[in-house]
Amino acid sequence: LADEYGLWIIEDACHAPGGYFMDSKGKKQHCGNGCFADCAVFSFHPVKHIATGEGGMVTTNSKELYDRLCLYRTHGITKDPALLHEHHGGWYYEMQELGYNYRLTDFQAALGISQLERAKAGLERRHEIVRRYNEAFSGIDGIKTPFNTADVYHAYHLYIIQVADRLGLYNYLHENNVYAQVHYAPLHLMPYYQQWGNRKGDLPIVEEYYEHCLSLPMYPTLTDEEQEYVIEKVIEFVAK
């Protein structure tokens, strides 16, 4: 469809570093490797797998797209001789696009690179936390755990359960110093998008999911004792 209609495919891999899936030929495909998308985007926000304070990354297998992204990153400016329209000396540069300042500082880049050394261990710890959550909530009426399949290695940026009384559980957990969160409010319900005609009821399945989803604490430094406390409080509320 993308080829037929001249569309770009952008893979949102912000929650997926280290994740992979098996394609139809049984080949492992890592998220963001460009196997089906023109480019992929990653986030380096403080709560993501790799953090640089703020920022992100775009990956692509296209040299043409790479050159354009480099322009957008630095105010639309280039000094690459191969891309210049004119040549006036080594100092010369051109503004060829309406770009912005999306440059990551060297300090932030160094911080991100240093975290690559523990990225695998962090991902393994996330899987251990998920296993413990799943085992604890297995068979408990009123708690729906995340769905996954054998051909996918999930990055588990979040651990999201679904419950009937999401607001009640959210409040109960916060009262007991468990900082659960909701991910995410549907975009079509936001005021900005509603001005373009989007309305509640347009996406009923999305809205149904939103009414019941709740993210539990999920980060590599979460201790077993802390997780047991979270589990205890969730089960306490659901059992009421």
Identify the role of each PLM range:
Residues E11-A51, W91-Q96:
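Conserved active-site segment immediately N-terminal to the catalytic lysine
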Residues G6, F36-D38, D141:
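Residue-level detector of structured alpha->beta connecting loops
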Residues L1-Y5:
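Glycosyltransferases and closely related glycan-assembly transferases
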Residues W8, A16, Y20, S24, ...:
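PLP-dependent aminotransferase class I/II
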Residues C35-K79:
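Active-site PLP attachment segment
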